[in-house]
Swiss-Prot record:
InterPro entries according to UniProt: ATP_synth_asu-like_sf (IPR023366), ATP_synth_asu_C (IPR000793), ATP_synth_asu_C_sf (IPR038376), ATP_synth_F1_a_nt-bd_dom (IPR033732), ATP_synth_F1_asu (IPR005294), ATPase_a/bsu_AS (IPR020003), ATPase_F1/V1/A1_a/bsu_N (IPR004100), ATPase_F1/V1/A1_a/bsu_N_sf (IPR036121)
Gene: atpA
Membrane topology of this protein: Peripheral membrane protein
Function as written in the Swiss-Prot or TrEMBL entry: Produces ATP from ADP in the presence of a proton gradient across the membrane. The alpha chain is a regulatory subunit.
HAMAP family registered for this protein in UniProt: ATP_synth_alpha_bact
Record's protein name: ATP synthase subunit alpha
Entry's family note: Belongs to the ATPase alpha/beta chains family.
Catalytic activity as recorded in UniProt: ATP + H2O + 4 H(+)(in) = ADP + phosphate + 5 H(+)(out)
One Pfam family of this chain: ATP-synt_ab_C
Site residues by UniProt (Required for activity): 373
Amino acid sequence: MQLNPSEISELIKSKIQNLQGASEVRTQGTVVSVTDGICRVHGLQDVMQGEMLEFPGNTFGMALNLERDSVGAVVLGEYEHISEGDIVKTTGRILEVPVGPELLGRVVNSLGQPIDGKGPINAKLTDKIEKVAPGVIWRQSVSQPVQTGLKCVDSMVPVGRGQRELIIGDRQTGKTAVAVDAIINQKGKGLFCVYVAIGQKASTIANVVRKLEEHGAMEYTIVVAAPASESAALQYLAPYAGCTMGEYFRDTGEDALIIYDDLTKQAWGYRQVSLLLRRPPGREAYPGDVFYLHSRLLERAARVSAAWVEKLSNGAIKGKTGSLTALPVIETQAGDVSAFVPTNVISITDGQIFLETDLFNAGIRPAINAGISVSRVGGAAQTKLIKKLGGGVRLALAQYRELAAFAQFASDLDEATRKQLERGRLVTELMKQPQYSPMSISEMAVTLYAADKGYFDDVEVKRALECEKAMIGYLKTNCADLMKTMESTADLSADSEKQLAAGIAAFKSSWV
């Protein structure tokens, strides 16, 4: 077989013409300086705000400052191996994290990578950490309750699905305890939970995870951890990553609860990053957009309509509304709620639960100040049963606080005032609750009904909780059907009320 040179050249030419080479255009630049996890990169022309950048050693960063001749980027993770002159490439993508039910029961970092030693997470989907909140048209009013299992919260500052309720107080006042109890109480209620721990000690986060595992709560919970040992950038990103994971459930017609513990540390992390990027400081050295930092995060918590769920699922899920409820935590310094970050978050949220050091030290736990704690939209979502019975509790506590201040100066009090003070002390005692022991609706209803109708009035204040426990135990044994009815209907009919009154009266006659 003889080869013809002209045929060979024609063959080569045709192969070259038909060559389909997938060319990839990527902008690249060089590192000019690297300090404290912040890199200045020169030569990146087509870079987006918030875009992921690829550094050597499979390390990623995020472009935050777009200047005329350089880009200020924050490194996500270790940065010791990055040096001046290294090549940095754009990716054309905004930062994404894995989402879906595969993450339930796992502990992940701010980038969605597992840190619990239980192997890789085989999530099928990823989503952007920065998303626009649903518009007004796509939202629905808050009308279904989130039962926290805490008497004082569910009766006086109720939380609804899709609400943002702030938990605010000094350090060591039980803020995390309220949030963790709320997660534990969601067992069997079809509510998925996301716990975002920001800037806490790793040992504290491990303790929370252990408690959730002990109470069987990890099976419906995702923990996003950005401990104090992590970089400021990862502490700043953690709430957005957790929110995206929670939004997956909201947008598939499910209900989710997210806890940010706490947003003060996130604001500190963002302040640190902003100052290192040489952004001009404002009040308390925070950057000018610290309000937007929290508002764009908390506005993503909402109750969305069935039309929104249908649109995002491309018509696969019909007739189901979804919700994402947020319980952000803010730590105050010496009770100063007029500081910059606390006032910002108070103005963004739909109410707040104030926890006070004085109450905590006096043994009133949860240390909730009922006078200044409010829920602006939760009242519409409160269960009928608790709404019907809880009104008297708030009134009794309000009158008690007013009289207690007056009684300090008055030596001789009339009988009516003395009774009211005694009743106030009793109700305050009954609002106490041990940690990790949330109550069901029916148990709460028994306490509220008995307190409202004066069944505890002849009980010593120090024995009130003992009496309450015995009463609930008695009714569970002897009036099991009534308790089941109250739990399932979440209402109290006239007939049920008669049975309840008879049951409590029978218990009181036997209790000493």
